């Protein structure tokens, strides 16, 4: 069941400029990020053993104390997502060369040890709220591509049993950037040329078949992410505008209100890949000159930024090593 939008915004109008908005990052001193107890993991293109490749880097919220978690010269690790308990990271790895190249889903401990393959020829993984389940999308084709929407079917992987189960809605396809709600009942994602949609942000049930197009609420663009309590979402409104809104998933259908931009950059740069901090007070994102924002796409000069919800944003990396896809790492849950 697909519930289509009937009152979409005309031509996806560009968001209004923020009052007094700054189109470039503020000075680093504008936000006190050193006091934040959470860290950030992201993909970065840098040299390992004399060879440039994609690695996963972990930093403090202010960009300090960088650690290369992967250090694999012959494997490209990308698209990291930290588990809600702060102990693990799921990601994709591009392995092989030429026609044998393939994108696979893995997870590992936060320190880079204990790597486990989840699925071959799969992509776009994210965690369930129990930190024991990973959702991922099967690749649409066997031949390697970085095209973000080249996906079909959503799967669940149980870390304890190793079992894979399909989502009940077998019609899910051409999705990307799936995000699982904190209560475990919903996903939000982008669809491109699939399921009766051209390009839209969707909400759909984790254990049902209903799919809802959020376009009618003014939620247009791509790559949505839930806030930590499931009552806010953030996403990219355009290449230059990042949005945030309130979302209510407790009724018969999703409702989105208070849609607003919070960061805007100049047209020579782009902003992508928003992610809420575990306390809901900050949003991390990627920023840099016009480039390929897709997972594994080349983006020279891109850095990781952090903003508060009022739109004060700063760069936390400055090396421009194609730093993208930031994901906040919660403080690890202590064992009882």
Regions found by a protein language model. Name each.
Residues 1-4:
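Bacterial N-terminal signal peptides
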Residues 11-336:
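Sequence signature of WD/YWTD-type beta-propeller architectures
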């Amino acid at each position: 069941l697909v519930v289509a939008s009937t009152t979409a915004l005309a031509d996806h109008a560009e968001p209004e400029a923020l009052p007094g908005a700054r189109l470039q990052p503020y000075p680093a001193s504008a936000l006190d990020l050193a006091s934040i107890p959470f860290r950030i993991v992201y993909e970065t293109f840098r040299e390992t053993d004399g060879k440039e490749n994609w690695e996963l880097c972990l930093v403090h919220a202010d960009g300090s104390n960088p650690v290369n978690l992967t250090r694999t010269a012959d494997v490209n690790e990308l698209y990291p997502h930290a588990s809600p308990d702060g102990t693990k990271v799921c990601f994709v790895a591009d392995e092989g060369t030429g026609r044998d190249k393939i994108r696979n889903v893995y997870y590992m401990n936060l320190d880079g040890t204990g790597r486990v393959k989840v699925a071959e020829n799969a992509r776009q993984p994210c965690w369930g709220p129990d930190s024991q389940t990973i959702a991922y999308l099967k690749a649409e084709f066997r031949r390697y591509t970085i095209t973000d929407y080249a996906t079909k079917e959503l799967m669940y992987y149980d870390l304890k049993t190793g079992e894979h189960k399909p989502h009940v809605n077998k019609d899910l396809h051409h999705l990307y950037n799936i995000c699982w709600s904190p209560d475990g009942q919903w996903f939000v994602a982008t669809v491109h040329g699939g399921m009766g949609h051209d390009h839209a942000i969707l909400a759909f049930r984790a254990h049902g078949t209903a799919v809802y197009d959020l376009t009618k609420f003014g939620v247009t663009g791509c790559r949505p992410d839930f806030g930590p309590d499931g009552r806010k979402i953030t996403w990219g409104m355009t290449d230059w505008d990042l949005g945030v809104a309130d979302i209510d998933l407790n009724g018969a259908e999703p409702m989105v209100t208070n849609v607003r931009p919070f960061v805007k950059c100049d047209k020579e740069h782009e902003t992508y890949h928003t992610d809420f901090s575990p306390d809901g007070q900050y949003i991390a994102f990627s920023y840099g000159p016009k480039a390929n924002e897709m997972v594994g796409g080349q983006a020279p000069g891109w850095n990781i930024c952090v903003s508060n919800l009022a739109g004060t944003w700063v760069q936390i990396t400055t090396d421009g090593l194609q730093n993208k896809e930031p994901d906040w790492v919660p403080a690890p849950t202590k064992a009882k």
